[in-house]
Curated annotation (Swiss-Prot):
It comes from the Bacteria. Keywords: Cell inner membrane, Cell membrane, Hydrolase, Membrane, Protease, Serine protease, Transmembrane, Transmembrane helix. Belongs to the peptidase S54 family. This is Rhomboid protease GlpG. PANTHER family: RHOMBOID PROTEASE GLPG, RHOMBOID-RELATED PROTEIN. Rhomboid-type serine protease that catalyzes intramembrane proteolysis. GO terms for cellular component: plasma membrane. Its EC number is 3.4.21.105. It catalyses: Cleaves type-1 transmembrane domains using a catalytic dyad composed of serine and histidine that are contributed by different transmembrane domains. GO terms for biological process: proteolysis. NCBIfam families: PRK10907.1, rhombo_GlpG.
Amino acid sequence: MLMITSFANPRVAQAFVDYMATQGVILTIQQHNQSDIWLADESQAERVRGELARFIENPGDPRYLAASWQSGQTNSGLRYRRFPFLATLRERAGPVTWIVMLACVLVYIAMSLIGDQTVMVWLAWPFDPVLKFEVWRYFTHIFMHFSLMHILFNLLWWWYLGGAVEKRLGSGKLIVITVISALLSGYVQQKFSGPWFGGLSGVVYALMGYVWLRGERDPQSGIYLQRGLIIFALLWIVAGWFDWFGMSMANGAHIAGLIVGLAMAFVDTLNARKRT
C-alpha cells in the first residue's frame, strides 16, 4: 500500500475518498494524528495524485459533495469526543515528547522558586574548563527558560513538531534529533554569547528544518510542515539577528539548529529519493 496524503480534517479526507470511489479508485483512510489516505493499487498512484492536486485547488467543488451523496454518505463515520482538545494533546505526543515537556516545566518552576542563577550553575553549558567533563551540561541547557512566553512558545512548537516526529518515525528518531541539535546548537550559541543561555529553541528549529525537508523529499514519511511556517521561521531568525523587537534571542542556536535539521532530513531521505 502507498500513502497518498494526510488531511487534518477527516471530512475533507472522506470527501476525496468518496470522489475517487466514483472514479473507480479505492482508497482507505487510517486515523493517526491526521486522516491518512492509502492506495492499495500503486499502479494508479499518478492518477490519484493528479486528482488530489485538483481537489486541493478547489475542495468545495460541487462534484465532490455529489460524490459523497453517490457513495451513500456525507459524513466521515467518525465519533467525535467531548474534549477534542485534550484528546489531541494526548494523541499527538509520545513519551519522549512528554518527558521533555515535563522536564522544561519542572526546571522553569525551580528557576522561579530558587532563582535563575542557582539553576544555571548546575545546568548551563560548561562555563569553566573544570566543568567540561560534566557531560550533561552539553544538553541540559535546553530545559532552561527565562520567561513564561519563552517556555510556552517553545513547548508549543516542540509538542507540534516533536510529537509528529515521534508518532510517525519513532521515539528513537526524536531522541537522535534532540541530542544532536542540542549539542551543536549549544556549541554555536556559546561561541556567540558565552555559556549563559538556555531554551529549547535550537532543537525546535532543528525539528522545523527536519520536518519541512523530510516532507518535501519523502512525502510517504507522513510528516510535513507548511511552507508558510518555514518562511515564518526564517523571518523570525532575521528579526532576531537584527534585533527588530528588542528581544534577546539565541540567534546562533536558531541558525545552527535549522541547519542541523535540514542536514539530517537530507541524509535520511537519500534512499527515498533514489526509490523515486
